[in-house]
Structures are given as structure tokens and as C-alpha cells.
Amino acid sequence: MARIAGIDLPKNKRIVIALTYIYGIGNSTAEKILEATNVDPNTRTDNLTEADVSHLRDEIDRNIKVEGDLRREISMNIKRLMDLGCYRGLRHRKGLPVRGQRTKTNARTRKGPARTVAGKKK
């Protein structure tokens, strides 16, 4: 089983699909990585040689932010917005939608379960 960026890749999947199990690598990034390392995208993960795995690992470590580093960068970006006090930061602080969606109705994913208000009837 190949272990790249702290993730055990699934054995019986094509390597182009298996790489997408790493947080921060999608289909297009996986294809670019395989092209840069000259690994066939149709190769199964369990058929990779140690050299292929080390080339993939080096390419990912050198050029792409993945897993913990990426999560940390995203959370730091959100924290920076909140510290600035800009509109987007305030929306993050209040737990409301950030990108202009309506909140009179809907927005339940961000706001959480509905809290009923006493005496509110039509």
C-alpha cells in the first residue's frame, strides 16, 4: 500500500483516482502530477514501483500544499478576515453565509437547526 502525504492510498484503484483521496488534490491536479512524474494514470496503486511512489511523493512535497498545511492556511485566511473586521470576517464570526446568499429563509447549513421563536405566528 502506497503512503503519500500521510495518507494510505487505496490498493485496487487507478493511481489518478487514488491521488484524489489526498486533501488538496483533485482530478486535474492528479493528472498534472502524473504527467510531471511520467507515471501512467491507468496504473493500479498496488502495481506502482517504489521509484514511482518516491517520485510522486517528491513532486507532491515540492509543488503542492496538501493535508495539514492546506487546512492550516485556509483557517489562517479565515482568521485574518475575522481579525480585520471586514464584512466577510463579520459574517464568518456570526456564522452566517459569507457570499451574499439570502438569510430570511434558508441558510440552515450555516445557521444550524431552526430555533423557534415564542409568539411568532402569522
Swiss-Prot record:
UniProt superkingdom: Bacteria
Pfam family, one: Ribosomal_S13
Keywords: Ribonucleoprotein, Ribosomal protein, RNA-binding, rRNA-binding, tRNA-binding
Gene Ontology CC annotation, any one: small ribosomal subunit
Annotated segments matching region Disordered: 97-122
InterPro entries xref list: Rbsml_uS13_C (IPR027437), Ribosomal_uS13 (IPR001892), Ribosomal_uS13-like_H2TH (IPR010979), Ribosomal_uS13_bac-type (IPR019980), Ribosomal_uS13_CS (IPR018269)
Acyltransferase as UniProt keyword: no
A molecular-function term among this protein's GO annotations: tRNA binding
Cysteines joined through disulfide linkages: none
Transmembrane spans: none
Presence of the UniProt keyword RNA-binding in the record: yes
GO aspect biological process, one term: translation
Entry function: Located at the top of the head of the 30S subunit, it contacts several helices of the 16S rRNA. In the 70S ribosome it contacts the 23S rRNA (bridge B1a) and protein L5 of the 50S subunit (bridge B1b), connecting the 2 subunits; these bridges are implicated in subunit movement. Contacts the tRNAs in the A and P-sites.
Quaternary structure (record): Part of the 30S ribosomal subunit. Forms a loose heterodimer with protein S19. Forms two bridges to the 50S subunit in the 70S ribosome.
Family (UniProt): Belongs to the universal ribosomal protein uS13 family.
Name this polypeptide is given: Small ribosomal subunit protein uS13
